[in-house]
């Protein structure tokens, strides 16, 4: 069984037992959270698509850790004007373990 959930402005296809890195969620490590914005639920060749959400569906997950992604380097330059700008960015994430899908 799999589900498509929406969290942090992005959509993820998840199944029970998978690990997933999502945008940072304010929850403690080891806490169990519920992702209730389920867009679709499927099992085998059957698929249930919500409009926009599947009613009564939820995904239970456990917070494994919090961390930061690798640095993305931004470099801006204007030719012939001696203008250069260096910038870096590291996005925070929360790693989840999908425990169960309730449909």
Swiss-Prot record:
One of its GO terms (biological process) is translation. The keyword RNA-binding applies. Part of the 50S ribosomal subunit. Contacts protein L20. It comes from Ralstonia nicotianae (strain ATCC BAA-1114 / GMI1000). PROSITE patterns: RIBOSOMAL_L21 (PS01169). Belongs to the bacterial ribosomal protein bL21 family. GO terms for molecular function: rRNA binding; structural constituent of ribosome. Pfam families: Ribosomal_L21p. The gene is rplU. HAMAP family: Ribosomal_bL21. InterPro entries: bL21-like (IPR028909), bL21-like_sf (IPR036164), Ribosomal_bL21 (IPR001787), Ribosomal_bL21_CS (IPR018258). Keywords: Ribonucleoprotein, Ribosomal protein, RNA-binding, rRNA-binding. One of its GO terms (cellular component) is cytoplasm. This protein binds to 23S rRNA in the presence of protein L20. This is Large ribosomal subunit protein bL21. It comes from the Bacteria. The keyword RNA-binding applies.
């Amino acid at each position: 069984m799999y589900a498509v959930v929406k969290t942090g402005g992005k959509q993820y296809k998840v199944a029970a037992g998978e690990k997933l890195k999502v945008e940072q969620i304010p929850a403690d490590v080891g806490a169990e959270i519920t992702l209730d914005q389920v867009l679709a639920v499927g099992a085998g060749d059957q698929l249930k698509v919500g409009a926009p959400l599947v009613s009564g569906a939820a995904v239970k997950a456990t917070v494994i850790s919090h961390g930061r992604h690798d640095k993305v380097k931004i470099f801006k330059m204007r030719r012939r004007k001696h203008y250069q700008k260096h910038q870096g960015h590291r996005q925070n994430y929360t790693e989840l373990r999908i425990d169960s899908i309730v449909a």
